[in-house]
Amino acid sequence: MVDLIIIGGGPAGLAAACKAWESGLRDILILERDKELGGILNQCIHNGFGLHRFGEQLTGPEYAGRFIEMLKETGVKVQLDTMVLEVTPDKKVHCVSKEYGYQIIEAKSIVLGMGCRERTRGAIGTPGTRPAGVYTAGAAQRY
């Protein structure tokens, strides 16, 4: 059993982990489905992040990087490339990853920091089955 599981390693999850550590929790686990921490911040290449927290303008990846560096100074554990399948009322998190396989992890507390996702081409009603050259903003920023 862990004290705190944070589902999502984006801005909310990173901030929650840092604050929980600052507040004295020591057995903290972040479960992130992507291969890296940062979430949507990794797609936000414009300035404007960090004014309140760090006193300077940062891009999304720079802002995420600051939190990631802060986490490295703690004992917060991170499992990347981990898909959460279910969260039960008795605070058991069912998840799966290549590295650890299928796991059921029990927690005293759970924070849901799953954030936002860009809607797919189909969800926004882009017509056709093969719209060559049509990319969402998030897809374009990845390449």
Task: Specify the residue positions occupied by each region the protein language model found.
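FAD-binding core/adjacent interface of flavoenzyme oxidoreductases
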Residues: 1-7, 65-143
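Beta1-alpha1 glycine-rich phosphate/pyrophosphate-binding loop at the start
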Residues: 2-62
